[in-house]
Amino acid sequence: MIKYLQSHLEEQGYLFVTLPKPDLAPLQLLTEYKGHLEEYDGSLLDLFEPDGSPFPIRDRQLPNFSGQQLLQTDWSAGADLLHGLFKLFQQKEDKLKASLSGMKGLVLSFAYENIEEERVSEQALDNFLAGAMPKKEGFQRSVERLQDGELYVLTSVMRSNQFTVTIDCQREDQGKLEAAVAEIVDAHASIERKQSNSFSLQTEGEQAFVFACRAAQVLYNKKQWFQFWKKDKDGFRIEKREGMVVRGEEDFSVQPLQAPSGLLKL
């Protein structure tokens, strides 16, 4: 399981994506399963009749987050995350675990560069849902999840096209670590070595991946479910959800790190 420290992102209501993905976007649906959010087929607009006022998707640069260490893990989880990032960047990862395994106390810290946020107004979304009518076709498959409070919608995604990982270990393994990082860099032409124990990898062209997001729970304010198709003052709404993570079927589960008090927050 991945273990992570509380970060600036969590403090501002963002959720981590366990293995960064290129295809997440605002208004995409998620479903809750065993305390995690997972991808769910379709968009919110597939479930409701349009009201003639499209949601503008806005982009903004987030320089304050670029270069910050946003995620820190131990080796047992960091190896999986690094392995997933290498696959996303279409890099061979065969030497990755072999080069770094066996050292004691490995800690991996991840930073992302060139961060952009793609978002939709949560207020506009909530206003839309307050009077929205479900589509009779295609909505029924989601009714049960909605009744159980398991349906979520993405309101914001953070994208990056470059990451830097810094690896720390116990002092007696420092020489081995520097040699291992050199071996990894030598095996991958796209990797740039930053310091003795850190390296950076950037995607080619404009391709970017989503590593964090915001999500809101879709709720329904009506006592009787058979009144779904009647339009009155009651209706749908969203509620922000924090403290969860987003994963796909191939991802590993995530738990917060039980950190001692006074531990530095990243």
Swiss-Prot record:
Record text about domains: The N-terminus has marked structural similarity to the mammalian gasdermin N-terminal domain. The C-terminal region wraps around the twisted beta sheet core, probably stabilizing the inactive state. The beta-stranded transmembrane 'fingers' of the active protein form by local refolding of several alpha helices found only in the inactive state.
GO biological process, one term: defense response to virus
Residues covered by region (C-terminal region): 248-266
Keywords: Antiviral defense, Cell membrane, Cytoplasm, Membrane, Transmembrane, Transmembrane beta strand
Annotated site residues (Cleavage) in this chain: R247, G248
Protein family: Belongs to the bacterial gasdermin family.
Other facts noted in the record for this chain: Might be a Bacteriodetes scaffold.
Keyword Cytoplasm: yes
Name this protein carries in UniProt: Gasdermin bGSDM
